[in-house]
Amino acid sequence: MKRKVFITVKTYPTLSKKYDELVCTAGILDDGSWVRIYPLPFRKLDYEKRYKKYQWIEFELEKNTSDMRPETYRVVNCATIKTIDDPIGTENYWRKRKEIIFQRNKIYKNLSELIDLAHENKLSLAVFKPKHLISFHVEATEREWSSDKLALLQGKVQQLSFFQTQEELRKEFSVVDKLPYKFFYKFSDEEGKESRLMIEDWEIGALYWNCLKKEKGNEQAALG
């Protein structure tokens, strides 16, 4: 079925043994409900199909039966992806964005309630508003993608090299730089329950690389 989705979530790319490079994308359907679009090889899309956050897009969707989370769908054919107008801006304190996201969606403030609903498989996407933002954390992690995933990609390149040009192979199998750090928020909910959540948004990766470039490769200066 063809649906319109208002994109609100786009993660930094990761490598998958099954699907190569992936970006987890989520947003609000035109009926106000949440949707997760998975898998979606974002960087392989033609430039005009590369959507931005807070932009309406249209494509053919069907339920992803390999993922039991209720909101998960997959794109039937990436060629059907169509961006609609420009991304919605931040004018009037994000008024238009808020109308689309909050009009039909509950704002959760109790984390235990959300966790219980997730355990019952009633939802896996929601709007959550912390009571307090306590701190921001940075942790070092592996600096390179795992060798087994890279080996699988290389094997696919070798299999396809007889049928595709080098330019086509570069487009399909170029690997995004791996972030050498993980970023977290620590926060509390309305009951005072403290939690830590990893930040996986595309923007956190872009911010790190931009700061690193600005600081001429000095990682500690880039991390602030």
Set out the residue ranges of the language-model regions.
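N-terminal ordered "arm"
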Residues: 1-65
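Surface-exposed beta-strand edges and their flanking turn/coil or helix-capping segments
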Residues: 40, 49-53, 72-74, 88, ...
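Short edge-strand/loop segments of extracellular domains
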Residues: 77-83
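Nucleic-acid-binding small beta-barrel platforms of the OB/S1 family
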Residues: 85-224
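OB-fold single-stranded nucleic acid-binding module
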Residues: 62-76
